[in-house]
Amino acid sequence: MHKEAEMLIGPQLDEKRWGWRLGDGSAAPPFLPQALSFLLLLPLASALQPTPLPFQELRLVGGPSRCRGRLEVMHGGSWGSVCDDDWDVVDANVVCRQLGCGLALPVPRPLAFGQGRGPILLDNVECRGQEAALSECGSRGWGVHNCFHYEDVAVLCDEFLPTQPPTRKMLTSRAPPTTLPNGKSEGSVRLVGGANLCQGRVEILHSGLWGTVCDDDWGLPDAAVVCRQLGCGAAMAATTNAFFGYGTGHILLDNVHCEGGEPRLAACQSLGWGVHNCGHHEDAGALCAGLGPPTLTALPSSATREDWAWQTDPSATGVGPQPSRETALLTTAAWAAGKKSGRLRLVGGPGPCRGRVEVLHAGGWGTVCDDDWDFADARVACREAGCGPALGATGLGHFGYGRGPVLLDNVGCAGTEARLSDCFHLGWGQHNCGHHEDAGALCAGPEELGLQVQQDGSETTRVPTPRPRDGHLRLVNGAHRCEGRVELYLGQRWGTVCDDAWDLRAAGVLCRQLGCGQALAAPGEAHFGPGRGPILLDNVKCRGEESALLLCSHIRWDAHNCDHSEDASVLCQPS
């Protein structure tokens, strides 16, 4: 993972910390939800040229253990502190690894371990993440800084020691599993965050602690082992990108590779306990058939939150491909807008296609609770409102608190329903919510895609689009229009796509979407030069048959751990 040597202004995601920090205190434009506040400008400022400095010693002081405290380094026979300009969890991970203290954790602010004394020796430390020692990272140079001791860096390590060496290995043991006091044994698994015990985020027990599994290389054979270990029948889907929400605690397994016949997940190959390069935004999940009546509708072999959800409907017995009538989402194909039902509206936003979701029932309007509210639900709401495809799902009363009853809760749509009320929910008026949890939707609107809708909302026709609209894609800096850096237009700005998980399948979807034939290559690392502006997508994972890039799995809109040195590109073979 490379980090730019420039200072970023605007919201930025610290790698593996999964939280925003606002560099200039700016607020998001009023027409965008909080989840898209990262679309503020991210101009690149004062170019630093990081230079590694030779030093060997560092320590953490003022904390409860040698693995937690204020960071100090030695230079010229004296200890000094490090300024927190540009400091993030990538740098902290290098320190923790060098000290043999595991992985870095978020540090409470401010001044968790007090202010230092003496010189401030380093500023603008820039690590790439793979360094064995902090001395291999760049900085401004010894004693060059613009800081005070209230900016001293503190580091908090989890003191978790992974299995060494970090190479792919078997986790099997000839010894029988050790049973713990709670009845669970080493290597036990569970599924968390789903609708029942047979679907959810995969968690595994190691040394008495539950932890998650990273989705690198995660697939249906791996999910099959989990389902069988739990007695949950066959695997219906293997999910990625924290489909069932972010876990907490340790990430215990990465690059899991099961043949499918193993009796336990711990018997599959992996990098070893605790060895990974992931964040909880990459938590793996599984959906199993279970022992009761089937509860899933139209699930592919690898489900994505954008395309799929589940219903507790005993009549849903089939498993098959997603209906394709509305998969042409953006850019090259017109959207077939559904007829407005008159029973759903979006209010509180900048227009009729962005706002708080309200539904009509028994002659009165009410709101929808954000429990389980996600992109698939927003897709149905946008369709029912006659507003084209969804761009995002919001919660926590983002578009203001509603009035009147909360009419729907725990909505679970597959994404293909004509009306929100057709989706699974707890029942009219059944909820445990307040209006601070009102759900919302951000829709492109027919006008955003260059479409013209008849007044009854039932038909659409393609019309020219003189300027880019939200969701449009382009390839930049190539020799022709079918090769270049991938850029997406959203929130009145063009932004890039990170190359994490970017592969030929994703490139194939994009080439096909742009009418550019087959994909020849999917280079990363800013092959066509680094872009500017926000990084809009990360961890894009396509199955290959999707008709639009945004139908592929990806991390939520407001999250990435990349910089523009990792911009994704494609080379297509025009047909």
Curated annotation (Swiss-Prot):
Inducing or repressing factors: Not induced by a combination of IL1A/interleukin-1 alpha, IL6/interleukin-6 and dexamethasone.
Gene3D superfamilies, per database record: SRCR-like domain
Keywords: Disulfide bond, Repeat, Secreted, Signal
Lineage: superkingdom: Eukaryota
Cellular component GO terms held in the UniProt record: extracellular region; membrane
Covalent S-S links between cysteines: C83-C147, C96-C157, C127-C137, C214-C278, C227-C288, C258-C268, C369-C433, C382-C443, C413-C423, C498-C562, C511-C572, C542-C552
Keyword Repeat: yes
Cellular compartments annotated: Secreted
Residue ranges of domain SRCR in the record: 58-158, 189-289, 344-444, 473-573
Family matches, as Pfam families: SRCR
Annotated signal peptide: 1-47
Keyword Signal among record annotations: yes
InterPro entries in the record: SRCR (IPR001190), SRCR-like_dom_sf (IPR036772)
Predominant cellular place of this UniProt entry's protein: secreted
Protein name, as recorded: Scavenger receptor cysteine-rich domain-containing group B protein
Organism: Homo sapiens
Gene (UniProt): SSC4D
